């Protein structure tokens, strides 16, 4: 607390510097990045609807725990989903007891989101929660993209 007394900051505000080597302008890079992320999220939602995304019971001591395996995905998609799941279902609605993301090794193509529920829950409810936050993330990147329209 003592060290935070003199600290002035805006919560959840991040400043980035984007530099280019000249092939694309900064605005084009941001626009393309938002489009790619929106497409990834749409593909993720389709995979959820088709039951392609592996949702496994976690082999941990945490009760009501599931692992969502993100195949061929890393921090870009995983941390977005983890953050939104955490904010919505852990911090606000308090139906999660745990929410975390891990990529076990840089050479692995897969990463894992681990979620634990307060009460016993089936995989369909988990898939619905994932679908909800993926839709929210897609909307967020759509809003960000409007700032970088050409």
What kind of feature is each model-predicted range?
Residues 1-150:
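Protein-protein interaction/assembly regions in multi-subunit complexes
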